Structures are given as C-alpha cells and as structure tokens.
C-alpha cells in the first residue's frame, strides 16, 4: 500500500507534498511522488529540474519516509501518470494540490485534478497552498 502525490514545483505542489508526507507518517506506508512532463521538460515549469529533484530527495530522506520518486517524460498526461502510479503501487490515497482557474481555463485546458478525482479507485485528498 502507498500514498501517491502528484507533485509540481509550486506552492500547490509543496502543499500536496506536505499533506502526503503527514499521511504517510500516520499510515506507516510508502510515499510515491509523481512528477511528469508530456513534452519538453526544459520549458515545462511543472517538471522538476535536477536541483529541485535533489532538494526533494533530501527533504524526503531527512523525514525518514520510505519513498519512490517517479520523474518521467512520457506521452501520457499527468492524470494518466498519477492514476497509473496509484494502480501500480496499490495506493490507498492520492494527494493533489489545487490552484484557482477561471471557468474558461478549465474548459480549454482540462483539469488533471478533475480527471484524477473522477477516475481514481481510491480516495483523493485535494489541498490548496496556504494563503500568505
């Protein structure tokens, strides 16, 4: 069993990671961090760069959590990658960070969170970044 978190290097991604880490500690299970890009990782700001990956690994190691980092560039979109990781690692929970989007933005771009919420076979925890 595991907790899967969809991670992007953003305030929303950090909020999701923090919540997922707490869930993993409470459940005594493994954390699966999914960070993916469909296209060119050099221009996709959602794709963690090498220094961000190192920082993420250090943070997870320091917390003493069993973890797996899936950092991929494939043809599948983020929702497909998160759902595939959840199935592969028998997730008991998926954690996602949410951000505000306009109705038009949702219509044109689609929503990774919406697809995961609708298609996941386990509970999904959706969190927002703290407001400052």
Give short role names for the model-derived ranges.
Residues 1-52, 59-68:
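Small/aliphatic-rich secondary-structure junction motif
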Residues 35-36, 97-99, 128-129:
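Short secondary-structure boundary segments
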Residues 48-53, 84, 108-113:
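Charged helix-capping and loop-helix junction motifs
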Residues 62-94, 132:
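Structural beta-alpha unit
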Residues 96-115, 119:
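Glycine-rich, Arg-bearing micro-motifs that act as flexible, cationic patches
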Residues 122-132:
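Short, flexible loop segments at boundaries between secondary-structure elements
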């Amino acid at each position: 069993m595991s907790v899967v978190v969809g991670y992007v290097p953003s305030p929303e991604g950090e909020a999701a990671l923090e919540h997922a880490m707490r869930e993993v500690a409470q459940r005594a299970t493994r954390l699966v961090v999914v960070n993916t890009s469909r296209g060119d990782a050099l221009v996709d700001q959602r794709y963690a760069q090498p220094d961000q990956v190192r920082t993420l690994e250090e943070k997870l190691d320091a917390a003493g959590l069993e973890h797996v980092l899936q950092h991929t560039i494939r043809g599948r979109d983020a929702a497909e990658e998160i759902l595939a990781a959840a199935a592969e690692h028998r997730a008991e929970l998926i954690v996602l960070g949410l951000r505000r989007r306009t109705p038009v933005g949702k219509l044109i771009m689609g929503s990774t969170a919406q697809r995961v919420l609708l298609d996941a076979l386990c509970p999904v925890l959706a969190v927002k970044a703290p407001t400052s």
